């Protein structure tokens, strides 16, 4: 009987702890993560977001230094507007860079990223598809999306990431090769770019972010997802451990 009571008390403690953990770290009242996520997985999401915040700071510093035009998009932009930072379950950073600035950005990232970070594209990674709409990524070398794979289940380096897309200007219209469904944005919707809070620093967003989000998601972007969808679409993450296959496929990144 004592054992049953003890187990029951332990269960109650776990439930209370998980609820408190769910409702911390967020600006959204009465928020809870998906029941699919364990306490450890929630902790890893938060640690991963903290690391990617540092990565985004480095990226932003380089862009500001070299006058490179960029702005956050997709879930990262929703996070800015609704949370002034991360959507609590988001698993990466999404952004656009002006096509005229991309070559300059590539060279700056190759030279100026700190130890532990790496610029990945088809030129630096033989496993990266040349025709990928995501033209490049900034990767953390000491972390892993445990369940994520490339096209057809192929493995490539999958440390925590900033996804880099490019946008183009054509006769006053803004084109997004990575999302051709967005056709109604003009230069006035993008410029002037705005500096806004993201966690403990500032990032760049477009001038009319709500028009972009309404076009991409409809009006539903402003409402919180159903509870069962509040988990990273990238799957499980480990903020502090490199995937084992990284050492085998990318010895040049780890043997110096």
At which residue positions do the language-model features occur?
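The feature captures the alpha-helical scaffold/lid subdomain characteristic of nucleotidyltransferase
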Residues: 3-69, 74, 78-89, 97-256
């Amino acid at each position: 009987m004592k054992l049953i009571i003890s187990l029951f008390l332990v269960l109650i403690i776990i439930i209370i702890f998980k609820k408190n953990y769910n409702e911390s770290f967020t600006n959204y009242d009465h928020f809870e993560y998906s029941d699919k996520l364990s306490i450890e997985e929630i902790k890893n999401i938060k640690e991963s977001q903290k690391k990617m915040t540092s990565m985004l700071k480095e990226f932003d510093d380089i862009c500001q230094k070299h006058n490179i035009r960029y702005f956050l998009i997709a879930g990262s932009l929703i996070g800015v507007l609704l949370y002034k930072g991360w959507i609590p379950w988001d698993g990466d950073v999404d952004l656009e860079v002006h096509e005229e600035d991309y070559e300059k950005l590539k060279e700056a990232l190759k030279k100026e990223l700190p130890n532990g970070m790496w610029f990945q594209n088809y030129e630096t990674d033989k496993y990266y598809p040349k025709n990928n709409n995501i033209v490049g990524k900034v990767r953390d070398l000491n972390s892993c999306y445990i369940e994520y794979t490339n096209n057809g289940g192929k493995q490539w380096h999958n440390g925590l990431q900033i996804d880099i897309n490019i946008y183009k200007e054509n006769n006053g219209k803004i084109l997004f090769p990575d999302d051709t469904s967005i056709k109604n944005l003009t230069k006035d919707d993008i410029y002037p770019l705005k500096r806004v809070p993201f966690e403990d620093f500032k990032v760049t967003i477009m001038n009319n972010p709500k028009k972009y989000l309404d076009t991409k998601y409809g009006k539903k972007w402003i409402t919180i997802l159903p509870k069962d969808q509040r988990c990273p679409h990238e799957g499980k993450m480990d903020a502090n451990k490199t995937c084992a296959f990284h050492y085998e496929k990318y010895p040049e990144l780890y043997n110096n």
